Amino acid sequence: MDDNLFTPAKTINFNLIGQDGNAFVLLGGWRRQARREGWSNEDINKVVDKSTSGDYNNLLSTLSAHCNMDPEDY
């Protein structure tokens, strides 16, 4: 979780695997789940801004660093 923007690391229960791979769908799903889990708009925007500051690989890397993905879902 080296890419996590928070200390201590913050994650949400969201699995990127099995989602539509469209960047907007991933961001929207991640944002909705973060809101459900009580994240502040400031923290959500921090992750979204970092996610959209580069290419698609940066998006996936940043979002996955902020997700608690269950390995059994792979």
Go through each PLM region and give its residues.
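Long, contiguous binding/interaction regions
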Residues: 1-74
